[in-house]
Amino acid sequence: MPHPLLPELEQLTQRVAGLQGFELCGIQLLTHMNPITLQVQIRHTSGSDVNLDDCAGFSGVLGEALEESQQLVEAYVLEISSPGIGEQLSCDRDFQTFRGFPVDVTHRDQGNVEHRLEGLLHERNTDSLQINIRGRIKSIPRDQVIEVRLTTPGQ
């Protein structure tokens, strides 16, 4: 279950990212760390690579916005990075690009039990992730999805 502050932090970060020419690809609030850590992944809306200077510049702007919003009242660490090239899908663009590709989906059910499914990525919308498992579409509520990774068939 996500931290109660995460939706507000995500909304603020998306707004700041958009104003700076970035797209928010991922955000995590790691409350088990001391101090807590806010990890943010960004990419340029133009599709160009994010470099270290971009991350440093965005860190300053987002840090100021976080201080002004007073959403995080305790000490925290802010980490800014790019998603890089990896197997984990995170941005809407990733889910559009890799539609029809084989994926492993890790999710929690309503009883908070973790499950893993394999299938072909069908669609992700605001409410759910849909994968094709042997010709049948399985819909998983988006808030229950932990991770979606590209895989190779038969792996």
Swiss-Prot record:
UniProt-annotated location(s): Cytoplasm
Keywords carried by this UniProt record: Cytoplasm, Ribosome biogenesis
InterPro entries per record: Ribosome_maturation_RimP (IPR003728), RimP_C_sf (IPR036847), RimP_N (IPR028989), RimP_N_sf (IPR035956)
GO BP: ribosomal small subunit assembly; translation
Function description: Required for maturation of 30S ribosomal subunits.
PANTHER family listed in its UniProt record: RIBOSOME MATURATION FACTOR RIMP (PTHR33867:SF1)
Protein name: Ribosome maturation factor RimP
